[in-house]
Amino acid sequence: VDGGFYKYYDHVKTDVFDNLKVMSAKYNTRDLLLTGHSLGSAGMTLMTYDILYDFPEYNILYFYNFGSPRVGNDMFVADFNAKKYFESFRVTHYYDMVPHLPPEDFYYKHISREIWYNEENTQYKVCDDDEDEDDSCSNSCAPTKCTSVDDHMNYLNVSIGSSGC
């Protein structure tokens, strides 16, 4: 797992799990929908992994990430995908640059089931990425054309934030 992503997750996980315990008691449920964008999706991937292995009392129903970077190596991805029992999508948008970081050349991989949206967010493709990234999806622009910050900040025609924040 990337050291920076782990450091970020390790910094917030106690607060997140404390709040999760409070909310699950308040609403009398342990069913979860987990989601994140960008760095938040990297943290959510690590949190999901922790839940799968260390918190079996929670029931993950859905896991949707938007603009996620590559979080771990092939062993991490294989372990994550093998344990996964819930609906899981890693949504990417056209030439978004973040899903191509850190580079594959450094042995980073994505967890499976990419959904790739076109430039206008009007059509999508369910990608064949069980074994490796699908070169007809987000990886089709790699490595030199995937440079769009705007695509990273706009998913499903919703502005996630602004460039430079």
Label for each model-derived stretch:
Residues 1-35, 39-165:
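Non-catalytic, mobile gating and regulatory segments of ester bond hydrolases
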